[in-house]
Amino acid sequence: MPSQHEIKQELVDAIRMLESAEYIDHNGHCSARRDASTFYINSGASIRGSLTVEDIVVVDLDGKPVDGGNVKPPLEFPIHAEVYRARPKINAVFHTHPQWSTYLTMTGVQQKVVYAQASLLGPMPAMDSPMSVNTREMGEKMVAVMGEQPVVMLKAHGVVAAAESILECFAYAVYVEENARRQYMAMQIGDPYVFSDAEQELCRQKLRSPSLYKKT
């Protein structure tokens, strides 16, 4: 079982890599479940590119810090809280603001599986609103659209990924954006090839592996 410090450091590493890759900006946030009613998340005021473990706060599902102090979570903490509330097997939630995925939702283009690793994501549903998910009601609506899928698109806004580990969630956040980039670029030439259901299943059998996630 990882220690609290190790979990915080893994979150810090993930956020800083995503920020460096321009998958998140100054407002992106990532979390990890601590138990049934609390989770770790980077503070709303933290500078993502120079994040440290001191910038990770533990909050309950209502966004209240459980260890005292005045460090507050991001305003969109309901993204994380409502996923954890609805899906007990999920242990990590990332909210990113990537370019290519957002371009597609801005124009109403549905992401398709055009890249082998995106087979792990399956259908990629999209919210029909660009508004911040900063209330429990909005979080519940997002979770309803997401269902049991690993990712959901927020129209003209960003992406939410959910997984059983920080490593897996990081990989999903990268895969969805790489898939969007390839789909967009292929659309400049013609109609992108979309993996069939059978091809996606074969890819899932080979690609669902922590050792491969680590190569992301």
Task: Annotate each PLM feature.
Residues 1-216:
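Glycine-rich flexible loops
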